Amino acid sequence: MPKALHQSWIDLSAGVPDDGSSIVRFDFSGTFSEGSHEGTVFAGRIEYDPSTPATEHHPSFAIYGQWPAPIVIIAVGGQVLTSAGAAVYDRVDDGRGGHFDFVTMFGTGEIAQQQQSFFELLFSAEDMSMLDGTQMPSARQLQDMPLKQVSFGTSDPADVISRGDLTLHPAG
């Protein structure tokens, strides 16, 4: 069995504009600490449009990053299909009369799911730098929370990235 993912959660709902008029962006970076990509740095950006109706059935929030960035899609309703397969995931109330569904995929076969309050995203309290050298600010002190996980698509533990350390902050 894969080791439990070491991940943390933080509530970023305060970063969503009240008027819903602008896209919220978060840059992220980190390093894989276990698995076949151990030590590899990844980085990317999250973009979220708070004006998108919460009840629409299409992805309204996604992390964009080049491999081996984690593939993270927060979708509204239904099922997410990825290049590695499909996953049914946890549904959470978004505080606006709708819901979000959380899927986090690491490597080739690791799915981590966690039901939390609106707009909580996994990351750890480590200092990281973006690939272009930009220094990330320190994350707040966080409390680790266990994640439910499902393993599929691989029988080789080396193919499963079982831990990701991630920092996240609002893009400038």
Where are the model-predicted features located?
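An extracellular/secretory-lumen and virion-surface interaction module
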Residues: 2-172
